[in-house]
Amino acid sequence: MKIGFLGFGKSNRSLLKYLLNHQEAKFFVSEAKTLDGETKKFLEEHSVEYEEGGHTEKLLDCDVVYVSPGIKPDTSMIELLSSRGVKLSTELQFFLDNVDPKKVVGITGTDGKSTATALMYHVLSGRGFKTFLGGNFGTPAVEALEGEYDYYVLEMSSFQLFWSERPYLSNFLVLNISEDHLDWHSSFKEYVDSKLKPAFLQTEGDLFVYNKHIERLRNLEGVRSRKIPFWTDENFATEKELIVRGKKYTLPGNYPYQMRENILAVSVLYMEMFNELESFLELLRDFKPLPHRMEYLGQIDGRHFYNDSKATSTHAVLGALSNFDKVVLIMCGIGKKENYSLFVEKASPKLKHLIMFGEISKELAPFVGKIPHSIVENMEEAFEKAMEVSEKGDVILLSPGGASFDMYENYAKRGEHFREIFKRHGGDEV
């Protein structure tokens, strides 16, 4: 048997390492970029054939090809492999095929899925279960096969789910779905279908917790599992309270909107799994939200600074804006072919001033109209402009609405740069 890897990112690297120890086969790695010396050495030491700098028809000799999640469906090699009948799969699918589906908790959504995944891991671990945290978040799922766990909590991206043939799992949570990654998916429908794929594979004994608003995007009648919606009369959250199964619980802190949605969604799932919420609320007290997600940095001259660098869609930006009255907003990065006219219409009541830089400024600028706005070159200039147009008591929010790759390695590097500038300007950190 010959196993191929189309792309050699984190997930395929972990899968190859696992297969080298557990399966007799020939392996072939095809990477569009140049492989580093350490990677080449590893492949050569394990007699793994490879190519770099592009993909060739050598992949056609493989019985199965594992696709790196980021590779687009319209890639010419994908089209060639499909036309020749070569089986395509993913590291995630391999994991799901080799684990008890009742132990898997899969979480997806356009915004908030990393935080919700981390929260689910936190409460399960706090309850005493040996829990694995991974998937699109951190560690590739296949690495969990080297150990024994009570639960596997996985963040699942639309890319992973698109390429996975049959991602079946017993516990599935969808936080929200809005337009995103339309630069990757051929349509919004394809994006929605990818996100919801596991739900339509579930059976009667499984659990599907989802945002009620999803019903406007896709008919869920074909889902056979137990369907529990939130943002309903029975399951919702206010600034102070959590309502689950119609019963009120006091939240143990003040949380921004997106975090309240995460707490609500995970609490509904937790209630369905364990039939009580008291332990969840106690464990919630100790949960530390992830950085770069509505992270309050502190003050400079009475101005309040928030780092929301993880917000890479306009839906996420609107969620951030909902926490404030008037905001000096910094947007940047690479847009995702969203409806910017609609975004500006919804955002404008919240905007004192909009500051833009990077690729997204070209897409946004035609729609900003009479909103006070500035286009600058980089984060340094954006920070200076924000100080200039703001006054004591104002909120200055970095919530980019675009991917980071035009100017930064990732969203975390972008957020760290914003924090670094904040410190350099004498920011009083909390």
Curated annotation (Swiss-Prot):
Pathway: Cell wall biogenesis; peptidoglycan biosynthesis. Signal peptide: none annotated. GO terms for biological process: cell division; cell wall organization; peptidoglycan biosynthetic process; regulation of cell shape. ATP binds at G109, T110, D111, G112, K113, S114, T115. It catalyses: UDP-N-acetyl-alpha-D-muramoyl-L-alanine + D-glutamate + ATP = UDP-N-acetyl-alpha-D-muramoyl-L-alanyl-D-glutamate + ADP + phosphate + H(+). The keyword Cell division applies. SUPFAM superfamilies: MurCD N-terminal domain, MurD-like peptide ligases, catalytic domain, MurD-like peptide ligases, peptide-binding domain. It is found in: Cytoplasm. Keywords: ATP-binding, Cell cycle, Cell division, Cell shape, Cell wall biogenesis/degradation, Cytoplasm, Ligase, Nucleotide-binding, Peptidoglycan synthesis. One of its GO terms (cellular component) is cytoplasm. InterPro entries: Mur-like_cat_sf (IPR036565), Mur_ligase_C (IPR004101), Mur_ligase_C_dom_sf (IPR036615), Mur_ligase_cen (IPR013221), MurD (IPR005762). GO terms for molecular function: ATP binding; UDP-N-acetylmuramoylalanine-D-glutamate ligase activity. It holds the Pfam family MurD-like_N. Its EC number is 6.3.2.9. Its main location: cytoplasm. The keyword Cytoplasm applies. NCBIfam families: murD. Belongs to the MurCDEF family. Cell wall formation. Catalyzes the addition of glutamate to the nucleotide precursor UDP-N-acetylmuramoyl-L-alanine (UMA). HAMAP family: MurD. PANTHER family: UDP-N-ACETYLMURAMOYLALANINE--D-GLUTAMATE LIGASE (PTHR43692:SF1). This is UDP-N-acetylmuramoylalanine--D-glutamate ligase. It comes from Thermotoga maritima (strain ATCC 43589 / DSM 3109 / JCM 10099 / NBRC 100826 / MSB8). The gene is murD.
